[in-house]
């Protein structure tokens, strides 16, 4: 329902998907008709372009469910308008999109809408004294970081992040990338950790500080290569991380998503990241048009 409840409802009516989309599109049309600004000086605010881009996304979603040609055409038209008339442009390479130097959404020309997590934004980035919400900031740098700081040669560092390792890629996701032709793979995933002061233990007597400590690959490593690395550094390949059917063997060590890392944190245990969260990028509009 779109009306507030004023008493106990004993027989609630489930709103249909169609009705929900009707309300969503009405809200977005209201935004576009309300003369929203086309630019923003205050980080993360909704602009006219953000409303149009979000509607293009949702039109495409709805069109794919209904196979509705008219909705597809509306999605195309809105996305094309954002591309042709908006102040956005594609980055020259994928790496620059998530480079920490370009993490300010207001200065990244590919970003249409974002959440402002800058250190000066005390609304989203404040330290909170709350049992449920301990602190603000962008926490994506935590949840994708694998458990590396208990491995030979490694200690927790700002460079490699604070490992909460809540999420990991499936084997299927890794196999979707052809790293020989797709520049996104190397930028999106971390595969190398260099020894940074941790104890090497008895199993790695030849490990060198500043050189490879852990190398992870989505491929199968030949035995001859494993034998050469023995005592020097740790190798983890697809057979170490995934079962034959693709299910997970280890949730602690994996090839983690690295594009959300935040090397600007003040300490190794700081959880408040200042990387802005990019919600909609103009790259998505090109995909919708395609």
Name the predicted role of every residue range.
Residues 1-47, 57-70, 74, 226-227, ...:
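Aromatic-anchored glycine-rich loop motif in surface-exposed flexible loops
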């Amino acid at each position: 329902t779109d009306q507030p409840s004023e008493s106990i409802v004993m027989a609630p009516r489930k709103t249909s998907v169609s009705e929900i989309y009707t309300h969503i599109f009405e809200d977005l049309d209201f935004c576009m008709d309300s003369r929203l600004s086309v630019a923003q000086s205050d980080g993360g605010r909704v602009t006219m372009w953000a409303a149009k881009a979000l509607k293009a996304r949702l039109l495409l979603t709805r069109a794919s469910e209904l196979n509705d040609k008219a909705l597809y055409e509306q999605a195309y038209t809105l996305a094309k308008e954002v591309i042709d008339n908006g102040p956005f442009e594609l980055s020259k390479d994928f790496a620059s999109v998530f480079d920490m130097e370009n993490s300010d959404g207001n200065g990244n020309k590919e970003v249409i809408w974002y959440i402002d997590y800058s250190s000066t934004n005390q609304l989203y980035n404040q330290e909170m004294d709350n049992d449920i919400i301990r602190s603000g900031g962008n926490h994506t740098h935590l949840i994708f970081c694998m458990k590396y700081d208990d491995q030979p040669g490694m200690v927790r560092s700002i460079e490699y992040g604070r490992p909460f390792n809540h999420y990991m890629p499936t084997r299927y996701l890794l196999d979707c990338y052809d790293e020989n032709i797709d520049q996104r793979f190397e930028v999106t995933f971390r595969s190398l950790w260099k020894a940074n002061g941790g104890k090497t233990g008895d199993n790695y007597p030849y490990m060198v500080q500043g050189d490879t400590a852990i190398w992870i690959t989505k491929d199968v490593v030949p035995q001859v290569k494993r034998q050469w690395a023995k005592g020097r550094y740790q190798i983890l390949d697809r057979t170490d991380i995934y079962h034959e059917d693709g299910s997970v063997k280890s949730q602690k060590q994996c090839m983690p998503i690295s594009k959300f890392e935040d090397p600007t944190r003040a300490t190794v245990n700081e959880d408040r990241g200042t990387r802005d969260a990019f919600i909609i990028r103009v790259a998505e509009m090109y995909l919708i048009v395609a």
